[in-house]
Amino acid sequence: MQPAAIGQLTLFPWGKGAMRFAEGIEDRSHELNLLTPTSQAASFTVDGPFHAIGLALLPLGWAALTGLSACEYSNRLLPASDWLDGAEQIGAELAEKYRDGNISGEECGHALAAYAADRMSPPNRRHMELIDQVTKWLGTSLYPPVEQLYSLTSYSRRQTQRLCERYFGLCPQALARKYRALRAAMLLNSPDLPEAAAAHIADSFYDQSHMIREIRHFTGRTPTRFAGADTEILREVLHRRNLREVQVGLPDDLIAGDGASGDGQENS
């Protein structure tokens, strides 16, 4: 199960698979793929052995690399060659070198990063400022009020909504729901989460059943089902280092000491 996430540029040198999205769409994998930003959890099946190497693309990176609307192209697994020049060639070259043992996974990742960096074309300055404002707004709490965002931007409410959909894939209200659920799942999966922090997380939802529904919608699992052996990959995906685009959203005195810190935003 793949939780709702930011976009990815991913190489699959070994194995093939398919992703099934909530809209009933099923996309088969390719050697080099664009996994577009997703608005809810999606299931996947693979014929292994299956290896995946790639880049997570923050909203600014997604826009700069692809130029695609994160909303119009959400919830898809697309061949990168349909959108990126030279993708088919570099995908085939890296996959062959990896299968032959001539390049490591880390080296593949660096090669993909260099390929992507050469093709980046950032949006205009005001749009970049809005992306930064939305990101910081999400980090102010687990479920920040939308009115707070509207007061931060230099755009009208409708323009802010439209640009948020373009770069983040969802309107502000839905985006806040997504990151509340993802961060709640990440924090509740932490073995040494303080009781006060757990209570604070619960208070950001209407009640326990609402929290369970929201976490299931965006991660594909309920909080009680993160402990099974079949969820090892899911738990890794929901690790703090893989939710780097926003701060944790907890008050400083409730932050757990296991790396789930709220002391700043990681960039990539």
What is each residue range found by the language model?
Residues 1-147, 152-157, 170-171, 188-189, ...:
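Alpha-helical bundle regulatory/interaction domains
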Residues 175-178:
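CoA-thioester-processing core
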